[in-house]
């Protein structure tokens, strides 16, 4: 975990510190540890989509809880990333309903188009690909989450088109500066 990145310290910027304090105030003083999920999410967003050990420690200290408890939360939920990820995190649900509707083929399309496998990031740091557990949208399987957006009722052609849209977005941004 995070062994490649050393000498990294985390602190909320002023805006996020104010937001964190507002979040904590929503809980009674004796229950402020309940703010762990939103604060870890806030830290992850500030840090480019992943949680360094120092970010987990910072949040634990802010909530006056043992680091290990905060670490347990960060490692339990798949929404937290403990290593750097690409700008776009493509998460393919591969649990039974999505698998029955072709999520394995969706995963293969992603691997082919991006030339990466599960838990890998493209060399340009634009995309990370992950297989994940249920996204809770089984009625519209198969489902893919890219950052905060859900894409439902996918098939191979739709997934290829979706990846092309993200790839073309990068090409146009690079050309337009």
Swiss-Prot record:
KW Protease (keyword) present: no
Named cofactor requirement(s): [2Fe-2S] cluster
Keywords assigned by UniProt, alphabetized: 2Fe-2S, Iron, Iron-sulfur, Metal-binding, NAD, Quinone, Translocase
MF terms in GO: 2 iron, 2 sulfur cluster binding; metal ion binding; NADH dehydrogenase activity; quinone binding
NCBIfam families cross-referenced by the UniProt entry: nuoE_fam, PRK07539.1-5
Gene, per the UniProt record: nuoE
Enzyme class (EC, first level): translocase
Cofactor note: Binds 1 [2Fe-2S] cluster.
One family name in Pfam for this protein: 2Fe-2S_thioredx
Membrane spanning stretches: none
Coiled coil is among the record's keywords: no
Residues annotated as binding [2Fe-2S] cluster: 93, 98, 134, 138
Domain of life: Bacteria
Record-given protein name: NADH-quinone oxidoreductase subunit E
Function summary: NDH-1 shuttles electrons from NADH, via FMN and iron-sulfur (Fe-S) centers, to quinones in the respiratory chain. Couples the redox reaction to proton translocation (for every two electrons transferred, four hydrogen ions are translocated across the cytoplasmic membrane), and thus conserves the redox energy in a proton gradient.
EC number assigned by the record: 7.1.1.-
Catalysis performed (reactions): a quinone + NADH + 5 H(+)(in) = a quinol + NAD(+) + 4 H(+)(out)
UniProt family annotation: Belongs to the complex I 24 kDa subunit family.
